[in-house]
Every structure is written in structure tokens, then in C-alpha cells.
Amino acid sequence: MQIPVFEVRSDGRENLIGALIMAAYYDIPEVTVYFNNKLFRGNRTIKVDNSSLEAFESPNMLPIAHMDIDIKVNYDSIFRSPSVAPFVIHDRLCRNVGLLRIFPSISIENVRASLQPPTEGVVLQTFGAGNMPSHRTDIIDELKKAIDRGCLIINCSQCVRGQVDVQYLTGKILYDIGVIPGSDMTTEAALTKLSYVLSKDCWGLSKKKAMMVKNIRGELTVTQPKPLRDIEIVSQIARFLHLNTSHELEFLRHAILPQLLCHAADSGNVELLRALRENGANLSAIDYNGR
């Protein structure tokens, strides 16, 4: 809350009531933040204002729900676990992690000190889409030395919105030496994820690197490996209806995915189920009969 709950005029009561309603009546198995009539995914949320009722924001993802006269929930955006397993709490985090924010006049001594043992992981905050000055070969060399000794370095943008793109030359230089692209993770999420991944002693270095680019709990956006129109039946329907734009295909997706899921499950077509899940279909969704 921004205004204490004991004040006559407070946002605390509305935030508490809204949070309780969302938790009690909606199946959203996530850690979330409810504030000012919006429900955000926790690992996508940052605090952007300390003196406004619009205090929290999810810069790279729309809110999961919005509470107005009616409560609108974007069920497609809910991140559900792909498997059913007992609930386990992992209560250890690696503390040997840090932040290194790049700026034009940063000294090599500053960089070197941030990468020295016992540091095991660093979130590198770079410019724009994951870039840094290409002429600073001294920084590149220090980063490579740290990576070679097993330090995980994650490239995150200093910008609030957008994601790291390794297609740019200066961003590709970092990628080529082993810096892991952080996609559109917030700095806070990247640091927390790094602490979690590094604490898993049962994982080798390659597994830890792979987990940093994997979408574990909806903290980053992953490019879909198979476009929706590549599913044969969707492609045929789109052609028949002369649908071409992304908006039209998205509308088609919402219209037919429940039927496709039911058909695939009924016929035992595991390959189709897998393709539908890769394209964002919720295997726990209800059909048009509410089942």
C-alpha cells in the first residue's frame, strides 16, 4: 500500500480485499502482486513510483487480471506447470551473485572487482538491446576470464521495456564469449533466478546455463518454436477463411484451440497436443461446455 491502512483515506483496504477475492475465487497458481485493481505476475513486476497509487508495473507483460465493475482475467497468460508433482520448497539461495551496471566511464578496476571470486554469478546491465561499447576490449577480456572460470553472466538491458537482442554486433560480441542473454527479464527476476540456479549443487555448469535461458516460471518470453499457422489444420482453416494478419490468426486461435485440444485428447494424438502446448494452448483449459 502507498497510504497506511489506518489512515481515513487509504488504498490498503481495497488492495487487501482485491487480493483476497483473486486468491479465493480464481484458479491462478502463481505468485502474484495485486495493486490498484491489477493483478501482476510477481516475477514480472517492478515498483516504479513511491508516491503514486500506480506504484507497480509489469513492463514486458500485461496484467493477468484487471478488477473493474467486472473482473477480467486473461486466462491465456496464466503460467501453469506442465507436470503434476508434490509441492517442494527450495530454501537455499546462492549469495555470491551481484549486479554490474555498465556506463561509459566505468573503470576496468571496478569491473574486475565485481567479477573476482567468490562471485559465482553476475547480472550485467547493458545499454539498449543488450549492447556495450565494442571498443572496451579490456572489459570484454575480464568478462571472458570470469566466464572461463565458471562464472555465469546474464545480459539484461538497463531499459525498463524490451528485451536483449544478440543480433546487434555489440550484443553478439557478449554472446560469443559466453554471456547468457537475459531476454526480457527484469533485473530483479534475473538476479533472483541466478541465485536459485547457482544454489542447485546437483546441476552441472551446462545445465545451469540452460536453465537461465529456460522459462521456468513465466519470468521471460520465449519465442515460439513453431508458428501457429504451421499447424496443418490451422493453416487450412486460415487459408479457407482468407485470414492473414496476426490479429485474425489470434482470433482463430481462441476460437478453435479448445476444440483442437478435445479432438487431440480424444484421438490420442500426442504430437498435436505437444504442438498446441508449444503454441500457448492451456492443457488445463475448459471446453465450451465448461468441462
Regions found by a protein language model. Give the residues of each.
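Conserved ankyrin/ankyrin-like repeat signature
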Residues: 271-272
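Conserved hydrophobic site in ankyrin repeats
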Residues: 275-276
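ATP/nucleoside-binding phosphotransfer catalytic cores, i.e., glycine-rich phosphate-binding loops
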Residues: 134-238
